[in-house]
């Protein structure tokens, strides 16, 4: 038997429309040294293709990826001195976007230009500036340095990336306000959760306790405590300071969670980790610790990816109090998709909210206890009865 629900107030999902532009702001393309190999690198981003190369001084340059002569792919070319040479006809393009030389021609069209993208290197990471209006970056929104990344007392970046298709960048931003998904997706108990949005920065403050009914994240996961401060600096680059405690063991680490759009319905998700080197630990053991921690972070990101791959876009989410400031976060995020002159005060004014986690944790702890008791009963049953 089926029920006709027409006309009884059924809430429909409003998927809305995808943005018609890409976010204004700094976007991280990865670890800078990975582009210092003496060859051009292609990057699919912002609905086009970019080429990244280092000049003779080691300065990284980013241009539109297709040659303005006959459309050759510059990322398939070579670096010659301070220019990238097209593989099609050897036209040479400088980091400023100007055509520097056409070797076979009597005259080089020196007024010919391609698009040159503003770049910055911060904490060993390469950034490119995107602005739909073509304005230069405001110094006030420059990505902050991470001093630990240059310290001998911390490990080097361990970096990962994955292409997410069928999902818009906003899906990952929504996680900033999502307290409940830490239990269901990441198997933790968030006992404290707070958001602060102000200017171009959106922050999340979290205390998370490991679930003792979860085995595959480590035998002592139930003893794990995490204090986390995570801030998006602009639309796509998050720095997450992590303070972990496992019983009597403490560790400090910094996680980068960032992305850049490929199309309006796909993006490259990147994450990188540096870990403070424990005093007295060998380089080999420190490297192993860093690798294990990064693998754990990667597992968490891939848990989110599975959701994004199968969910639908929703502009009118139906929320309860514990879901927090989803609409306020989206209002903050909208500032990067409008002209600077159209930024409204409410997009950048300070907004602060602490989510009451008491009711949620009462329910979740009861579920954890139930799972543990079920496990005890199962363990007491002789093997031949399983």
Curated annotation (Swiss-Prot):
Enzyme's top EC category:
oxidoreductase
**EC numbers:** 1.14.15.30
| InterPro entries (UniProt xref) | Cholesterol_7-desaturase, KshA-like_C, Rieske_2Fe-2S, Rieske_2Fe-2S_sf
In terms of superkingdom, the source organism counts as Bacteria
State where Fe cation binds.
175, 181, 186, 304
| Single GO molecular function | 3-ketosteroid 9-alpha-monooxygenase activity
**What's an example GO BP annotation here?**
response to cholesterol
Query: What is catalysed by this protein?
Result: androsta-1,4-diene-3,17-dione + 2 reduced [2Fe-2S]-[ferredoxin] + O2 + 2 H(+) = 9alpha-hydroxyandrosta-1,4-diene-3,17-dione + 2 oxidized [2Fe-2S]-[ferredoxin] + H2O; androst-4-ene-3,17-dione + NADH + O2 + H(+) = 9alpha-hydroxy-androst-4-ene-3,17-dione + NAD(+) + H2O; 3-oxochol-4-en-22-oate + NADH + O2 + H(+) = 9alpha-hydroxy-3-oxochol-4-en-22-oate + NAD(+) + H2O; 3-oxochola-1,4-dien-22-oate + NADH + O2 + H(+) = 9alpha-hydroxy-3-oxochola-1,4-dien-22-oate + NAD(+) + H2O
Record-linked PROSITE patterns: RIESKE
Q: Which cofactor does it need?
A: [2Fe-2S] cluster; Fe cation
Keywords for this entry?
2Fe-2S, Cholesterol metabolism, Iron, Iron-sulfur, Lipid degradation, Lipid metabolism, Metal-binding, Oxidoreductase, Steroid metabolism, Sterol metabolism, Virulence
Q: Which pathway does it take part in?
A: Lipid metabolism; steroid biosynthesis
The UniProt record lists the Rieske domain at 26-128
Entry binding sites for [2Fe-2S] cluster: 67, 69, 86, 89
Give the cofactor note. Binds 1 [2Fe-2S] cluster per subunit.
Q: What induces it?
A: Induced by KstR.
Its quaternary organisation is: Homotrimer. The two-component system 3-ketosteroid-9-alpha-monooxygenase is composed of an oxygenase component KshA and a reductase component KshB.
Describe the function of this protein: Involved in the degradation of cholesterol. Catalyzes the introduction of a 9a-hydroxyl moiety into 1,4-androstadiene-3,17-dione (ADD) to yield the 9alpha-hydroxy-1,4-androstadiene-3,17-dione (9OHADD) intermediate which spontaneously form 3-hydroxy-9,10-seconandrost-1,3,5(10)-triene-9,17-dione (HSA) via the meta-cleavage of ring B with concomitant aromatization of ring A.
Q: What is this protein called?
A: 3-ketosteroid-9-alpha-monooxygenase, oxygenase component
């Amino acid at each position: 038997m089926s029920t006709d629900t027409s006309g009884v107030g059924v809430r429909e999902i409003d998927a809305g429309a995808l943005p018609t532009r890409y976010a204004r702001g700094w976007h991280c393309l990865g670890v800078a040294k990975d582009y210092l190999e003496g060859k051009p690198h292609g990057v699919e981003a912002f609905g086009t293709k970019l080429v990244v190369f280092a000049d003779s001084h080691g300065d990284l340059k980013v241009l539109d990826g297709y040659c303005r002569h006959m459309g050759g792919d510059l990322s398939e070319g070579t670096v010659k001195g301070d220019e990238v040479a097209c593989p099609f006809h050897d036209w040479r393009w400088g980091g400023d976007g100007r055509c520097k030389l056409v070797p076979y021609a009597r005259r080089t069209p020196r007024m010919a230009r391609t698009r040159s993208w503003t770049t910055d290197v911060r904490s060993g990471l390469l950034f490119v500036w995107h602005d739909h209006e073509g304005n230069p970056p405001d110094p006030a929104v420059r990505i902050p340095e991470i001093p630990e990344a240059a310290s001998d007392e911390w490990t080097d970046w361990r970096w990962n990336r994955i292409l997410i298709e069928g999902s818009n960048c906003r899906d990952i931003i929504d996680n900033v306000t999502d307290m409940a998904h830490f239990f269901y997706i990441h198997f933790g108990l968030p006992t404290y959760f707070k958001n602060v949005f102000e200017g171009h920065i959106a922050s999340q403050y979290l205390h998370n306790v490991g679930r003792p009914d979860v085995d595959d994240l480590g035998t002592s996961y139930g003893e794990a405590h995490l204090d986390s401060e995570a801030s998006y600096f602009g639309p796509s680059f998050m720095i997450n300071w992590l303070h972990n405690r496992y019983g009597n063991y403490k560790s400090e680490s910094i996680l980068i969670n960032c992305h850049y759009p490929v199309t309006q319905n796909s993006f490259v998700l990147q994450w990188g980790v540096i870990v403070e080197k424990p005093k007295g630990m060998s380089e080999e053991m420190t490297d192993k610790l860093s690798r294990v921690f990064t693998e754990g972070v990667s597992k968490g990101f891939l848990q989110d990816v599975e959701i994004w791959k199968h969910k639908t876009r929703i502009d009118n989410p139906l929320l309860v109090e514990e879901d927090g400031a989803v609409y306020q976060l989206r209002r903050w995020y909208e500032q990067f998709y409008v002209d600077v002159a159209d930024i409204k005060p409410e997009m950048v004014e300070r907004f602060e909210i602490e989510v009451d986690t008491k009711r949620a944790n009462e329910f979740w702890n009861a579920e954890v206890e139930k799972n543990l008791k079920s496990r005890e009963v199962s363990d007491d049953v002789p093997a031949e009865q399983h």
